[in-house]
């Protein structure tokens, strides 16, 4: 079990839910990194004795390196920019941090069924998709021990934490998954006895039984 984790992009929805979960159910020490966190995070989080808050962007090398110093594992809440991911990889390498979990979008490898793939790419800006693809490529080409979590379409439901893991190369049929389920999946991965299946792996997270042509909430 890890003792020290850094969460990059700590103001994101999944990042905030993960922060709350880790503070409630573990004794981990969290370093939260992102822009304007003092106004975007709840005061209880900002003042928690096991939380260190560092404000900055991914393009601020000194602050970024400060944030990952002493981290045993780093969580990247969004992989949307190749240049940002390159900066993260550089900071982790300089501080000798090897373990990283990053959130990416599903569908970049043609793993969606045709109808869901068409709906997905019809509803996302080309620039966003390109940024996701570039960021993923940067991480995969690094020497880090990464786990890329490929997420289908997201929604919120605190009562629904159902998820399934879809290995790389397997068709990804699930059209949706809750952010709460994603947090549970991350929590479970952090607690596995054998991390081998997650080493330098790309794994999808979906909600079982949601084999739709588009998310049910659209």
Segments predicted by a language model, with ranges:
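Conserved glycine-rich Rossmann-like NAD(P)H-binding loop of the short-chain dehydrogenase/reductase
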Residues: 26-35
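NAD(P)H-binding glycine-rich loop region in Rossmannoid oxidoreductase-like domains
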Residues: 5-6, 17, 37-94
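Core catalytic loop region at the nicotinamide-binding pocket of NAD(P)H-dependent oxidoreductases
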Residues: 192-215
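Substrate-positioning beta->alpha
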Residues: 149, 173-188
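A conserved pocket-lining segment of Rossmann-fold NAD(P)-dependent short-chain dehydrogenase/reductase
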Residues: 163-177
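N-terminal Rossmann NAD(P)H-binding glycine-rich loop of SDR-like oxidoreductase domains
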Residues: 2-25
């Amino acid at each position: 079990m890890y003792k020290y984790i850094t969460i990059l992009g700590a103001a994101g929805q999944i990042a905030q839910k993960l922060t709350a979960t880790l503070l409630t159910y573990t004794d981990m020490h969290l370093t939260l990194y992102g822009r304007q966190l003092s106004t975007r995070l709840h005061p209880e989080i900002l003042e928690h004795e096991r939380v260190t808050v560092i404000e900055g962007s991914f393009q601020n090398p000194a602050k970024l390196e400060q944030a990952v110093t002493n981290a045993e594992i780093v969580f990247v809440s969004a992989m949307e920019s190749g240049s940002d991911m390159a900066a993260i990889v550089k900071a982790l390498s300089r501080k000798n941090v090897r373990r990283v979990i990053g959130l990416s979008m599903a569908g970049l490898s043609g793993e969606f069924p045709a109808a869901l793939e068409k709906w997905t790419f019809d509803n996302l800006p080309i620039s966003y998709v390109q940024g996701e693809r570039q960021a993923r490529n940067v991480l995969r080409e690094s020497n880090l021990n990464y786990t890329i979590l490929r997420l289908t379409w997201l929604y919120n439901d605190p009562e629904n934490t159902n998820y399934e893991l879809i290995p790389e190369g397997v068709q990804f049929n699930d059209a949706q998954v809750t952010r709460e389920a994603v947090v549970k999946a991350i929590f479970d991965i952090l607690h596995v006895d054998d991390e081998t299946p997650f080493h330098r792996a790309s794994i999808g997270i979906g909600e079982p039984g949601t084999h739709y042509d588009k998310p049910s909430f659209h």
